[in-house]
Amino acid sequence: MAVVRGGSYDSTSHGANTPGLVTPEQINHLISNLNLLDQIGNFEHYNMNRIRLVWSRMWSVLSDFFVSVGLSENLSVAIFVMDSLRQLAMKFLEREELANYNFQNEFLRPFVIVMQKSNSTEIRELIVRCISQMVLSRVNNVKSGWKSVFMVFTAAAADERKNIVLLAFETMEKIVREYFPYITETETTTFTDCVRCLITFTNSRFNSDVSLNAIAFLRFCAVKLAEGGLVCYEMTGDNVSSNTPDAPLSTPVPTDKDDYASYWVPLLAGLSKLTSDPRSPIRKSSLEVLFNILKDHGHLFSRQFWVGVINTIVFPIFSSLHDKKEMDEDENDEYSEGTTWDSDTCTVAADCLVDLFISFFNVIRSQLPGVVSILTGYIRSPIQGPASTGVAALMRLAGDLGNRLTEDEWREIFLALKQAATLTVPGFMKVLRTMDDVNVLGIAQSYYDVDVASDQGLSADGLDDDDLQMASYIVSRMKSHIAMQLLIIQVITDLYKSHTQPFSEANISIILDIFSSVATHSQKLNSNTVLHKKLQKACSILEISDPPLVHFENESYRSYLNFLQNMLADSPSLTNATLVESELVVVCEQILHIYLKCTGAPSEKKEPNQPVLHWILPLGSAKKEEVAARTSLVVSALEVIRGFERDLFKRCVQRLFPLLVDLVRSEHSSGEVQLVLSSILQSCIGPIIMQ
């Protein structure tokens, strides 16, 4: 083949653009003669000085040839043609690329295609070495060629050979550390390609150090972006963006030359995706780096961009946590695994979210409902660790924001807590109903029969392995459910105590609904005596502790009682004080009913199928223990009644007096009840009788 050294456009079109040049038959012929391959290299070399468009037309044909030969099964020929291409590329990169052209990218494209398609380890390693040599020796002239460089390294990052991955990352490390300004001086997509390449390295299964270093380089990229002034604004209004994250921001409008989203979004989105990586160190590192980037450079973001980041980058991180809560709760095995995150990752994520929201509250306060929903999702977790994390995070969020929250924002918090308390109940009750099909010998289905047999021993007969497994799961679920419900009312109590200003009556109403629903739910659980006996027998056989049902009922009513009492004391100007007082009377009345039922005192309302009792039997040991456990609560209720104002006591004495009389006739485990009861009769009932 003749070497073309000059001539017009037409003189090249006949030789270089002839379709037959790259037919399979001619390629096979060229492969058999390395001299012809060398001649093609010379042909391209001597035509580099032609008009760029002319050269581009020639190269569109020759590049296909290099790809075809580079993918040849003949390793020697493939190596030869890749080395020839390297020499041509080194020569080509000596020339400065014209503005707004992408000739370099076109020239290097054969490396990309062969790297992606070649089955030869030797060829892929050679390409990585060739690209590394070219970019490090000609970095000043690389412009559009960066795209091909990063595409080659991206393919190398996903390679099945460890040495290729490490070799490519070594060059990437040098590029990012020493030549970062060259990456962003041409076009936005170049930086995006660099970020995607680093993210691919984070997924490397060969070396965790490579993954962690790649994540660190992503943070380095963010620092360089911020330092380089790539984000600037034309502000609207009088306010100017402050360097302090918490300063109020007017809405910045990006200028035409400031396409900042195309720089930040791929970087942030890549880190967000890494938070679901199966490797714990990678998850934690990506979480910390992502939120550190947002905290350190968030002051550069407009309000509109922040909203997009929160909804598309931050919130999806926690989707696995929510998905786990929303799964069907009768799937026993699902709950044994917990969330896809371990406890440490859950804690890191919650802390980072709260820190970020507090730092930029004035900018992203509209996203409060989403943040609260995530934290209450933690609280709803059937696992103790995430639930405790959610409580701590929500308390810190409310504590640090303090009086900056509006009543509507407090309403969002309380509604989310109410939802967390109520939405889990139907699924939990569905789980409990599975015990209805478990028949246990020695346990009757009648309330009265169960009650009088409470002190009889329970044998292991009547429960097979499947029944025991089911009971074990239900006990575990019940313990987690009780802990979650108590956590919610504890959070509300702590929020109320820490809030210096009175809540609105609308928010007080929501709080009362939560206390009422939890207390009612606890009483309903405690009233199912047959279920208790089944679980008690199973726990005895399995040698595990019983679910703390009495404790649940005591604490829920105690918290409800204390909240009502504190609210009346702290808010004397409350317009609906009468309604709160009425609710307080109802709660006290309910506590007395529960205690009297436990002591076996006769009541006007009898259980179905319960025979008439002509005398009261002494309490058995089990009932005595329960009465002792309930004593402190009933004493608290009696002390509240004793503290009623005279007018309030007169209004409710008709409802309370029969209960007080029943208390006189009941058997108690402590003298405290009689002592407070005597005080009520003397200081409250006596004056009314003496009138």
Spans of features found by a protein language model:
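Intrinsic disorder/low-complexity flexible regions in very large eukaryotic scaffold/regulatory proteins
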Residues: 1-691
